[in-house]
Amino acid sequence: MTPFWISAFLDFAPDEFAAGVDHWRAGTGFGLSTTRGETGEFASLLPADGDDYLRVQRLGGGPSRIHLDLHVADVAEAVAAAVESGATVTGRPEGPDGYAVLASPGGFPFCLVTHRAAVRPTPAPWGGGAWVSTVDQVCLDIPPAVHDREVGFWSAVTGWEARPTSDEFTNLVRPGSSPLRLLLQRLDEPETGAVTAHLDLSSTDREAETARHVALGARVVARFDGWTVLAPPAGTAYCITARTPDPIDPEARS
């Protein structure tokens, strides 16, 4: 099982949906698709070029969160492979889309979908072209009790090599066509609990990008050598990292 594309879903609590969508439209520079779903609960953030990979959902209840969509050729085959690797199926909605809702061994929600996508968008320019930035990583925040199991699981269901960079972080080595990297972070605490996630941005000017997000209403929560943690006006916290955007393989855009 190897997904050909990965999308991140920003799932907002009902009272945070409008403000959350506005913040991420401004933060990414992306447009917004028409809404879809029975109550208009779904939409996609549309980059200036390439295929979309960030989507939004208004939840029926509960707190805001992130979940992943893994795009696969055959949902039934992918479900079988994911379950064999330790996933639990939590829903198989009726309808033409034929998607499946699952949870990882540590309880992180994800979906298997068949929507086609192939072209990774270029980073967005800011400050008159002085710097660029992009949302290019989902970091899974993993309690120690399930860390090793989650690393093995996500490497298996993506087919991406797990490459530890420290006791705290493990990178999954993405193919050049993927718009999102996956980073697995071992939390210090709590010892147990469900796996959660947050978005990470890369930029050619971390300080300027941080200031831009603060001007959009985000609040700086903490600064570290490799990243800055921000709390948006609505939704989950996210990070602006010290990484610069990875180059895009021209052949992957042909």
Segments predicted by a language model, with ranges:
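Hydrophobic, ordered structural segments
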Residues: 71-76, 84-118
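C-terminal functional regions that serve as terminal interaction/effector modules
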Residues: 198-206, 212, 219-223, 229-248
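Short proline/glycine-enriched turn/loop motifs at strand-loop junctions of beta-rich domains
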Residues: 72-75, 203-207
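Core segments of cupin and vicinal oxygen chelate
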Residues: 1-52, 77-78, 84, 90-100, ...
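N-terminal beta-strand motif that seeds the catalytic metal site of vicinal oxygen chelate
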Residues: 1-21, 66, 113-152, 157, ...
